[in-house]
């Protein structure tokens, strides 16, 4: 139904939800300029996770862009980061909510990578892919649906935008859990992959700090009186590195070790910082157990030392289930009609907020933002022509849920 405009839906009722989805897809045609203008406004504001003022400015822009009939906005205050945002619609009675999840923070501190730039068919800038582009996709899909039958015709929507995803969502995870409880599906609009592949699996992530304690002594006069914390920690590092199991998708990386004060002093203190990745919740729990066991064994081999292990699982994995595979197929059919790819992505090593929804038992898929490359680098870009079809795919999917 070409030619629809935001003010033309008054009194108009779509005969079927499929027609509503097609009307929304038609409404989006020719609106790339609007979408790009909104994206540029978001990208031009630095919203590094620790830039609270910048994050709040981006949040204010999002609230303006999402000021739609039937969509309420809630600001969830933060004491550490920019405020988190939760948008809700009442939706059609009898239908379970659908959750849409994103984040407004980026990884670039002020001065590192700034501004929005056009480069032929590409658009470059901090967060253009990860993931302000995804937020624009969500926003314009909802605008199209509001203009083509109204959000009240859809399932209840729960849109959550957190401000701390890039540091593991220490606050945002709880905001998400509270907002989307009872949802029947969760779609996450992180960076779109090559071929528009849909993410159904992400590794879980963890972090651990091992602190070795020993006894200082002069290395020449009283070596025998010391207890070498670095030696105990070295034994620990060797043990935990051997827990890596590539066929099972388990990796351990001891990325930083510090300790000691000089070559002529037996060190009484040493610290190792460790990254953990795993594919199943059971593997994550087992890794934490084996870490603590390795610490005990390593210290027992160096009399007078002990090793304390802090940390553990930070994000549960996004695990593929029959329900998430069905969700991928349903969304994928809408993506295909919209001219996009709809295959399944390979296992992804990094975590996202899809892991939070998945751990709640909610079928979840990810990577639905605009197609691009280079997230977390100064080469970050999107293919601008994917903005409209990505929004069309979401609009068609949400309409299909109400049919």
Regions found by a protein language model. Give the residues of each.
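Acidic/histidine-rich catalytic neighborhood of metal-dependent amide-processing enzymes
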Residues: 131-203, 245, 402-403
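Acidic/His- and Gly-rich active-site-bordering loop/insert found
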Residues: 18-126, 147-153, 354
């Amino acid at each position: 139904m070409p030619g629809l405009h935001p003010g033309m839906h008054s009194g108009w009722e779509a005969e079927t939800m499929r027609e509503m989805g097609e009307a929304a897809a038609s409404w989006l045609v020719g609106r790339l300029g609007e979408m790009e203008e909104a994206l540029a406004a978001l990208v031009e504001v630095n919203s590094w996770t620790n830039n609270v003022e910048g994050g709040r400015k981006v949040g204010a822009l999002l609230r303006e862009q999402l000021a739609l009939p039937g969509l309420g906005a809630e600001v969830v205050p933060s004491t550490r980061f920019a405020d988190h945002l939760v948008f809700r619609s009442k939706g059609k009675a009898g239908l379970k909510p659908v959750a849409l999840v994103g984040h407004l923070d980026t990884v670039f501190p002020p001065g590192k990578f700034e501004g929005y730039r056009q480069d032929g068919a590409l658009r470059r800038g901090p967060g253009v892919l990860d993931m302000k582009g995804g937020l624009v996709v969500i926003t314009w899909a909802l605008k199209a649906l509001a203009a083509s039958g109204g959000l009240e015709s859809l399932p209840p929507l729960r849109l959550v935008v957190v401000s701390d995803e890039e540091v593991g969502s220490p606050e945002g995870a709880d905001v998400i859990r509270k907002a989307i409880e009872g949802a029947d599906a969760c779609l996450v609009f992180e960076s779109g992959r090559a071929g528009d592949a849909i993410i159904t699996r992400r590794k879980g992530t963890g972090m651990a700090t091992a602190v070795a304690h020993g006894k200082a002594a002069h290395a020449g006069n009283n070596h025998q009186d010391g207890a070498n914390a670095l030696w105990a920690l070295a034994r620990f590092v060797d043990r935990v590195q051997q827990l890596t199991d590539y066929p099972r998708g388990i990796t351990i990386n001891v990325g930083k070790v510090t300790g000691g004060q000089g070559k002529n002093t037996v060190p009484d203190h040493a610290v190792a910082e460790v990254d953990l990745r795993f594919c199943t919740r059971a593997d994550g729990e087992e890794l934490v157990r084996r870490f603590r066991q390795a610490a005990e064994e390593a210290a027992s081999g160096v009399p007078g030392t002990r090793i304390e292990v802090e940390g553990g699982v930070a994000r549960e994995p996004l695990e593929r289930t029959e329900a998430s595979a069905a969700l991928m197929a349903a969304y994928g059919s809408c993506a295909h009609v919209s001219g996009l790819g709809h295959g399944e992505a390979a296992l992804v090593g990094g975590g996202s907020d899809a892991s939070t929804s998945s751990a709640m038992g909610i079928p979840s898929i990810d990577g639905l933002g605009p197609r691009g490359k280079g997230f977390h680098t100064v080469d970050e870009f999107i293919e601008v022509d994917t903005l409209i079809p990505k929004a069309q795919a979401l609009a068609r999917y949400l309409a299909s849920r109400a049919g």
